[in-house]
Structures are given as structure tokens and as C-alpha cells.
Amino acid sequence: MSENTTPETAAASVQDSFELPSAPDQFQRLWTPHRTAYVSGGQKDYTEKTCPFCTAPSRSDEESLIVHRGEHAFVILNLYPYNPGHLLVCPYRHIPFYDDATEAETLEIAQLTQLAMKVLREVSHNDGFNIGMNQGKVGGAGIADHLHQHILPRWSGDTNFLPIIAQTKTMSRTLDDMRVAIAEGFARLS
């Protein structure tokens, strides 16, 4: 990058000339080399002693960003949220896959997911959700050794190019503010 080049102009100047001659797709591609470490196996292996989802319940809710504790699972704010209110439902046990969960864990993860959706609607007034689990390193899980379900509130028009071009996310509320509001919502609705 030259002295006058910004991340925006650098990204805009990258040209993608790859097209199959028989099937032009008309898509432009934005290359994100900063993700190479992640997709090439840069994720850490966690043990029960080093796993952030195993150590979080032993700390205060404020310190760990936990918004609700159940018997077999808990709900925690994502430390690296896609949107304000991005929650994770985690079993207390250090298990990597959904089919490793007991019947009681499976039931409580489902119940906490439903409750979290109600809380987020009340607190955030979102328009929809993305809900899911990435399992295993090749499945895209950032912490592959400890099962967790993402609950991502969505609003109309909440997608933009800032994360890709400027490595910046716009967040309308701090994690602390969201933790308090969501924890209060869980207290009211559970």
C-alpha cells in the first residue's frame, strides 16, 4: 500500500478477472487476506482449563458477559459480535458436537434459544434472527471444542461493507450496556 492508499481504495483497486469463459457470473469479489489465518487452521485447541466457555461460569456475570444461567446451559454475549445482542447458548459441559449433548442439555439449549429470542425482541426490537451452530474446525467454529449456538439478532438494512473494507463494525451499544439490558430481560421473562 502506498502512502496515499487507504483500505477503501486498496480494496476497490483489486480486480478479479477470473471467470469461466462459458459461464460468466457477473460477480465482483472482495479478497480478504486477513482471514487466511482463520480459514487455514489458525483456531486454537481448547481444554476444559483454557476454554473461555468453561471458565466463564466461574467468574461473575458482569466479568464473563453471562446474561442467564440455567441448570445445564447458560447464555453469554459474544465477545466478538456481528451485531449488538449477538448471544451464544453454551452447555456447561465441554463437548464439541451437538450429538454429544445429553437429552437434558439438548432440551435446555432449545428452551434457552427460544427465551433468548423473546428477550432480544423485547430489548432490541429486531426484525429477525440468524440461529445456528458451527461444529468442528472445518465447520467454521471459532471455538470448536465447546458446543455453542449462535443467536444473532437482525434488522432490515443491517449489512454493509464496513467490516470488509475498513475492518470496522458499527455497534450502537457497548457490550456492558447490552449485557445489563439482556440480563434484565431474562429476569423479567424467565
Annotate the PLM regions.
Residues 1-190:
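HIT superfamily nucleotide-processing domains
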